[in-house]
Amino acid sequence: MTRALRRVARCTRAQTGIEFTLVLPLLLFLLLGFIDAGRLIWTINRAEKATQMGVRYAITTDMVAAGLGSYVFTQAGLPQGASIPTTAFVGVTCDSTACTNKGAGPPPGYSATAFANLVQRMRFFYPEIAPANVVVEYDNSGLGYAGDPNSPDVAALVTVRLTGITFQPMTTYAILPPFQLPEFRSALTMEDGTGTVAN
């Protein structure tokens, strides 16, 4: 054993150094690739968890589409106790600036405070979220009835979407721009839709 070590110590050909120089970049690239894969999975997990917690918050607190919560569908000619058809309410889409109807339906209104609170809740799980990345949708689920005394009349299917999230791998940082991750979404049926506190 010591004879082999002495022979290596006396070697002046630098073969080992050259081999190490050739292999080191590949090993570093492989190591950074493993780290990038872990970072990507972590980013996807945080984005998914942010949408899950966002929709849980959205169904139990004030509606972003503020007009939907107080609208009584008997005003639209539906008899008291009738289920809300898609001809009376299709859905509402809300972003960081306004809410718009997807078709027929009541004036959606817009609560900037409710939207800001929702985004803030999602940032607990993914701090890089900007308001422009969040979209909230209220779709007709077939639940609810006109003139519900406990309001809202419609128990909408609430979907929180997270769009425009990018990821920059370390291995291609200098040569490629960040790439777009797919849209993340989570949906639950509306509960009471009022209040400012949710757990």
Language model features by range: what are they?
Residues 12, 48-52:
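A broad detector of short, well-ordered amphipathic alpha-helices
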Residues 21-42:
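C-terminal juxtamembrane segment of a hydrophobic transmembrane alpha-helix
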Residues 1-13:
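N-terminal leader/signal peptides at the extreme start of proteins
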Residues 2-3, 52-199:
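Short, conserved structural patches
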Residues 14, 25, 127-130:
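Proline-centered flexible-loop/turn and helix-kink motifs
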Residues 39-48, 63:
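Membrane-proximal amphipathic alpha-helices
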